UniProtKB/Swiss-Prot annotation:
<dbReference type="InterPro" id="IPR036259">
    <property type="entry name" value="MFS_trans_sf"/>
</dbReference>
<feature type="transmembrane region" description="Helical">
    <location>
        <begin position="517"/>
        <end position="537"/>
    </location>
</feature>
<feature type="transmembrane region" description="Helical">
    <location>
        <begin position="210"/>
        <end position="230"/>
    </location>
</feature>
<feature type="transmembrane region" description="Helical">
    <location>
        <begin position="413"/>
        <end position="433"/>
    </location>
</feature>
<dbReference type="InterPro" id="IPR020846">
    <property type="entry name" value="MFS_dom"/>
</dbReference>
<feature type="transmembrane region" description="Helical">
    <location>
        <begin position="50"/>
        <end position="70"/>
    </location>
</feature>
<dbReference type="InterPro" id="IPR011701">
    <property type="entry name" value="MFS"/>
</dbReference>
<feature type="transmembrane region" description="Helical">
    <location>
        <begin position="356"/>
        <end position="376"/>
    </location>
</feature>
<dbReference type="Pfam" id="PF07690">
    <property type="entry name" value="MFS_1"/>
</dbReference>
<keyword id="KW-1133">Transmembrane helix</keyword>
<dbReference type="GO" id="GO:0022857">
    <property type="term" value="F:transmembrane transporter activity"/>
</dbReference>
<feature type="transmembrane region" description="Helical">
    <location>
        <begin position="151"/>
        <end position="171"/>
    </location>
</feature>
<keyword id="KW-0812">Transmembrane</keyword>
<feature type="region of interest" description="Disordered">
    <location>
        <begin position="1"/>
        <end position="34"/>
    </location>
</feature>
<protein>
    <recommendedName>
        <fullName>MFS-type transporter PC-17</fullName>
    </recommendedName>
</protein>
<feature type="transmembrane region" description="Helical">
    <location>
        <begin position="247"/>
        <end position="267"/>
    </location>
</feature>
<dbReference type="GO" id="GO:0005886">
    <property type="term" value="C:plasma membrane"/>
</dbReference>
Length: 543
């Protein structure tokens, strides 16, 4: 039987947030103006829609999450054709960076916007921006237009995924959300894995522009469902607009955007366009660090009007999920990118075949994600599943790091499945943890924090993995095939190795690739192992 201090899933959503906030000010009934503003979101009794509406809304936002997931990876196989059509090889990195930078820069701001304004209309505006960006990308006659379109889509993406999670919190009680959240996460995960495959199919069979056209009808379905079936959240009309605008923390946002852009540019350019000792990379890190410190000071100064109120970061569950999310998602990102590289380079299969060989990860994520959601709905406790997710992910990552050129299907299927099971357990659960631990009025900001950490993890660990891979590949080639210039291998890409190298050196080249990829997997092993410490920071009785 749960302890008396436990937070019960079926009653948490109905807690009186006003009593909690009042207690912080001496137990009186008069709360500061900004605190009263925060409580406007959920101060009315919660009325959840019927089953049919819940299913339709969940399917609608899941479809949109699928599109957002696709946009993260679908260009991986389309970029060569795009750069060839526009003669824009120098712009190649911006096709990905423009989307990622804008998304990461505005996610936290959308957390505050969802706090003060209608969830329904904020989500629809975000979806409109995403669709507009996709339309521009699909029809643009120039490389510059594609970059602009990607940036606009990134702005919309910043509001879509946190909005999807917040919508779920408005249509279902907490004890029913694990299954819905898992479904959203699974759709996004499937899109991320299948993105390169679809990008290749569209590029080869139709046109790379269909990588963006596909978003338009799917987004249209989501817009119709949300418009007609999601009720508009109530916001008190007596709250002055000036208070809402002030609460969006414009000063913090102006400082935060260049800070995160500088950090992400340093991570993306370091080791790729410039070496890590280059003055440009060093200056970007310095700018990011200085502005980051200034932003933290602004958060302490603004308090309740900050982008992230400091009191939220004093909660163990918020800190724990952040510590958990960065390395956990980092590990998933490493294997999401480098397992296909291992299949295509070492095993010599095509991009579409590597996608099929990646199915054990996808199936493991789907099956365990859904099963664990049902179990959590029954037992209530979340932390044990966070721990188990870290353990399974670390073990699967460790086993994958033993891959050899001769490794058979039993090995890469079984080891991948374990990674998928770990991912299914731990990838989306931090979102439920923060929803269970924070007052209802703080759910939008807390959700945005976790999703921002997921994006940040992708940037950090993709940079780490790229550096490890390139350095180890160059080192292995110098040792195994000293007659071959390592730069020629790095510049030539990871596919078609058997066509580029003679048979007498090909086995050594393949061994060098195997060594480079498995050493990159070590970064994933370390990350998954570190994530378990974040799970232990979370209060055990968060249910």
């Amino acid at each position: 039987m749960p302890d008396k201090g436990n937070i019960q899933l079926d009653t948490l959503q109905h807690q009186d947030h006003s009593q909690e906030t009042a207690s912080r000010y001496g137990g009186g009934s008069q709360l500061p103006e900004q605190e009263r503003l925060d409580t406007n979101i959920q101060d009315d009794p919660v009325e959840y829609p019927g089953l049919i509406r819940v299913i339709l809304i969940t399917l609608g936002v899941a479809l949109c999450s699928f599109c957002v997931g696709l946009d993260n990876t679908i260009l991986a196989t389309a970029i060569p054709k795009i750069t060839s059509e526009f003669n824009s090889l120098e712009d190649m990195s911006w096709y990905v960076s423009a989307y990622l930078l804008v998304t990461s820069a505005f996610i936290l701001s959308f957390g505050k916007i969802y706090t003060y304004y209608s969830v329904k209309w904020t989500y629809l505006v975000s979806l409109g921006l995403f669709e507009l960006g996709s339309l521009i990308c699909a029809t643009t006659p120039s490389s510059a237009g594609l970059i602009v379109g990607r940036a606009i889509s990134g702005m919309g993406s910043a509001g879509i995924f946190p909005g999807s999670v917040i919508i779920l919190s408005n249509i279902a009680p907490l004890h029913q959300r694990p299954l819905l959240t898992a479904f959203i996460g699974i759709m996004s995960g499937i899109a991320t894995v299948t993105g390169p495959i679809l990008g290749g199919v569209f590029t080869d069979r139709l046109s790379w522009r269909w990588c963006f056209y596909i978003n338009l009808p799917i987004g249209g379905v989501t817009a119709v469902v949300v418009f007609f079936f999601l009720k508009t959240t109530k916001v008190k009309k007596n709250v002055p607009t000036s208070h809402k605008i002030k609460g969006l923390d414009w000063i913090g946002t102006v400082v935060f955007i260049p800070a995160i852009v500088s950090l992400l540019l340093a991570l993306q350019w370091g080791g790729a366009r410039y070496n890590w000792q280059n003055v440009r990379i060093i200056m970007l890190f310095i700018i990011a660090g200085v502005l980051g410190i200034v932003w933290l000071l602004i958060q302490c100064w603004k308090q309740e009007e900050a982008t992230i109120p400091p009191r939220l970061m004093q909660r163990r569950s918020i800190v724990g999920t952040c510590v958990y999310t960065i390395p956990f998602v980092g590990c998933v990102i490493v294997f999401g990118y480098y397992l296909p590289i291992w299949f295509q380079s070492v095993k010599g299969v095509s991009a579409s075949q590597s996608g099929i060989m990646n199915l054990p990860t996808v199936v493991g994520t789907i099956v365990v994600g859904l099963l664990s959601s049902v179990i959590i709905m029954k037992v209530g406790y979340m932390v044990p599943f966070l721990v188990l997710g870290s353990v399974l992910l670390a073990v699967g990552a460790g086993l994958c790091s033993t891959f050899q050129r001769s490794s058979g299907s039993a090995e890469w299927i079984g080891y991948q499945a374990m990674i998928g099971m770990g991912s299914g357990l731990g990838y989306q659960l931090p979102l439920l943890v923060v929803q269970a631990d924070v007052p209802a009025a703080d759910v939008p900001v807390a959700t945005a924090v976790v999703i921002f950490m997921q994006n940040l993890a992708g940037s950090i660990f993709s940079a780490i993995a790229q550096t490890v891979f390139q350095n180890q590949l160059a080192k292995s080639v110098q040792i195994l095939v000293p007659s071959v210039n390592p730069k020629s291998i790095l510049d030539g890409g990871t596919v078609g190795l058997s066509d580029r190298f003679p048979s007498d050196v090909l086995p050594s080249i393949l061994q060098a690739y195997n060594t480079a990829v498995t050493h990159t997997f070590y970064a994933g092993v370390a990350a998954a192992s570190l994530s378990v410490f974040g799970a232990f920071i979370v209060r055990w009785n968060v249910t």
